[in-house]
Every structure is written in C-alpha cells, then in structure tokens.
From Swiss-Prot:
It comes from Xenopus tropicalis. Belongs to the VOPP1/ECOP family. The chain crosses the membrane at residues 60-80. Residues 22-59 are extracellular. Keywords: Cytoplasmic vesicle, Endosome, Lysosome, Membrane, Signal, Transcription, Transcription regulation, Transmembrane, Transmembrane helix. This is WW domain binding protein VOPP1. Residues 81-167 are cytoplasmic. It is a single-pass type I membrane protein; Single-pass membrane protein. The gene is vopp1.
Amino acid sequence: MKSLHCVGLYLLSLLCEFTEAKKHCWYFEGLYPTYYICRAYEDCCGSRCCVRALSIQRLWYFWFLLMMGVLFCCGAGFFIRRRMYPPLLVDEPTFNVSYTRQPAGPPPGPQHPGMPYYSDPGGAMGNPVTPSFHVQPSPQGNPPFPPPPSYCNTPPPPYEQVVKSCK
C-alpha cells in the first residue's frame, strides 16, 4: 500500500511538471475560441503564434538605457565640439557710454528763470537744460544713433509739485 502511494505521488509530480512546462493559449476565430499550446518559456501572442518571453522587444529597460546612451553621446559630442571649435566672434562697432556727474553747486553762467535745480540722492546739483550724457562722435561725423528725446534730458519734478498739481 505504501509503494502504491509513492508511485501515485511520483506520477502526480510528473503530471504537474508536464503541465507547468506548457502554456495553454486561446484566441477567438469568428465566434468560437481556438486553443493551442506554447512552451513554458514562450508567451501567447494571438493567432497560434508563440514568442519567446525574453525577446528584445519586451526588455523596456534595454531600450531605455540604449536611448539614454545615445542622448548622452550626442550631448557629449555637442559640448566637445563647442569646446574645440568655439564660435567666431563677430566684430561689432564699439558703443561707448559714459556717465559724468555734474559739478556740485550751481553751474556758472546765465540761469534760466523758472527752471529749478533738482538734486540727486548723492547731493550733486545739475542743470536740467544741459544734457547729462556725452555722445562721442563717430569717425564719419554723424552719430550712430539719433539723440534721445528732449524729455530724457530733464529730471522728473519733485514729489511735492506733483501732489500739488494733482489737487
């Protein structure tokens, strides 16, 4: 009786081993299902076809690493190329802008009546009629840019005057 149990267990284990080694697959052909069998290392793919489970298409991490490697190589090549062959600098005309402060105190010469002097936070006084910038002449004789509008040459009115004019 004991040997019968051992033989039964052995046959049952063989049956389990053989059924695990195969995959039972099916698909619909018309209205009825059609069954077929694939090996254990294959996957069912549809109409009676089996594909290997570790095919290159299913390895998403392989494709991800491949794309990251390609992007890294392109980026490294771009930066190496920029380092070895820097872009040529185009000679642009020099544009000199100089800022000069007016001397402290009222300027000598005639003063215009009704034109008050405004002081900047540093305490220097300036004449609103004289421009606070100096354009350096170009070699051709005419300036490279037109002068700024006249309202740019005068400082803004004091706060008290603006408040009084609004009331």
